[in-house]
């Protein structure tokens, strides 16, 4: 399973709303678009049109990850996920695992501490250790659902990323490139600094020599 950024956002929103606002679930296209474009609890913040959301929904429908539902006497089509924990889903997740996967789909890479703090509406973890235990279970499957990222400078905890979407693989390839670019930039700066200093010293030596010559000429003319 490899979801695009928009597909991952749609699935994440459906998972979230099923738990946090069950009375409004399934979601209409308009409600789903509003959920995808929330300014809070989303990273990155998107501004998707209903057309873009519909394209993602249609693609997920073809992948059998979404189903349509029409109420009796209503023309409004609503959507529900078939991502996990349904009779049609191969994937079955515990409430704790579902909360972690949902948060990673909606907000990208996060630390165990961040996941615990942000999961209170989805699942109540008693402490960070419980989050870490659940993460280990998700990583220890035959086909892991999560991956640990290299710890960043200044961070006490490593971040974890879900492996359901293309965004996670792009992040993996982007990080080494970014790191190598930074190292190269520092190396160039360090190499460039002595060269600039040497050039400046040469210019000053030349100016001193010219001034010395003019001073000698002035003394000679006065004697």
UniProtKB/Swiss-Prot annotation:
Source taxon at top rank: Bacteria
Segments traversing the membrane: none
InterPro entries, alphabetized: DUF480, WH-like_DNA-bd_sf, WH_DNA-bd_sf
Protein family according to the UniProt entry: Belongs to the UPF0502 family.
Protein name stated in the entry: UPF0502 protein Sbal195_1802
């Amino acid at each position: 399973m490899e979801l695009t950024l928009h597909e991952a956002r749609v699935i994440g929103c459906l998972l979230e709303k099923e738990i946090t606002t069950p009375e409004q679930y399934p979601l209409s296209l308009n409600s789903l678009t509003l959920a995808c474009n929330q300014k809070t609890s989303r990273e990155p913040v998107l501004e998707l049109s209903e057309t873009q959301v519909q394209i993602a929904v249609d693609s997920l429908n073809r992948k059998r990850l979404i189903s349509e539902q029409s109420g009796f006497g209503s023309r409004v089509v609503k959507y529900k996920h078939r991502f996990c924990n349904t009779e049609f889903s191969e994937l079955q997740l515990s409430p704790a695992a579902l909360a972690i996967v949902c948060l990673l789909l909606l907000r990208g890479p996060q630390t165990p501490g961040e996941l615990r703090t942000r999961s209170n509406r989805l699942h109540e973890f008693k402490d960070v250790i419980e989050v870490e235990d659940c993460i280990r279970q998700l990583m220890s499957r035959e086909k892991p659902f999560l991956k640990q990222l290299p710890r960043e400078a200044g961070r006490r905890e490593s971040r974890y990323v879900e492996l359901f979407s293309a965004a996670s693989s792009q992040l993996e390839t982007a990080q080494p490139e970014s790191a190598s670019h930074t190292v190269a930039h520092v190396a160039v700066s360090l190499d460039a600094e002595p060269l600039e200093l040497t050039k400046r010293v040469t210019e000053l030596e030349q100016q001193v020599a010219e001034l010395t010559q003019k001073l000698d000429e002035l003394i000679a003319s006065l004697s």
